Amino acid sequence: MSAVIENHEHDHHGPQKGILRWLFTTNHKDIGTLYLWFSFLMFLTGGAMAMGIRAELFEPGLQLMDPIRYNQLVTMHGLIMIFGAVMPAFVGLANWLIPMQIGAPDMALPRMNNLSFWLLPSAFIILLSTAFMEGGMPGFGWTFYAPLSTNYPNIAYFVFAVHIMGVSSIMGSINVIVTIMNMRAPGMTLMQMPLFVWSWLITAYLLIAVMPVLAGAVTML
């Protein structure tokens, strides 16, 4: 009887292959790799904008672009480098390292982990699509000061993109907290956790506290 049962184990249902593996993966290492590749792509995009900024500043006077386009490049460079390169890189490292450092088999909420990543490309597609709208990309600098932040319909798309990024960050933070608090190896106390895990536990709580405030602030622009 046991031989019959063994023969009916799901031999033909291995892991998905190709693009489907990356679209639907719930493995923390795969999702961490997706975060790191996305971060690298955004780093190249933001770096190209930085090169445009430096080329414009190479000599006094107008070289390559008018002041409006320059402000737009500065704004998008800042948004992409912070929200698209730095933060996803940290989250990618967290996905890779936290389960291994606390002895967990995976993140506690793997499907939420997958969704929190795929929200990010959606947000940046919306953000970069403002380049093709009336008035071009947001051009209010890193401070979001009015009246630069009150013109053109692209500001609404920027606000929507920031909301999506905030939802992604909150979902990722909840996942980190639940994983650390509930999936540590037997016998591992909080005081025995590595410093990297502690830093991410505190960061996750801070992100949950801060992201709604940021969302409210940009909504009131």
Predicted regions and their residues:
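Membrane-embedded and interfacial regions of multi-pass energy-transducing membrane proteins
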Residues: 2-221
